[in-house]
Amino acid sequence: MNAVEKNRYTEAWQAFGLAHHRPRAVLCVSAHWYTGETAVTAMERPRTIHDFGGFPDELYQMSYPAPGDPDLATEVADLLGASVSPDAVALDRSWGLDHGAWSVLVHSWPEADVPVLQ
């Protein structure tokens, strides 16, 4: 619900976005993405995922059309894999951004113009 509410949390996320320079990209780690492997999203345009149920329609209508960055995703996968094994991190081109990511980012960077990896 924080995605559509105004409260101390959403105000803090908004203040964070205003107080910091626009980042090159954002890497989100979400507890809502269950995989059998470590993976990072690697598509140009990740879709907004509504991975929840029983909430007001307003929440299901929200979209966070931030771009992805496949080249950066490859770099992240390589860096993480270097500490484990070269193929330890998969590049995922199907998932998108779940509400663990976009419900926060919609307040910090509402223009959705910062590339996001998850």
Feature locations, PLM:
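Internal, conserved structured core segments that host functional sites
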Residues: L72-Q118
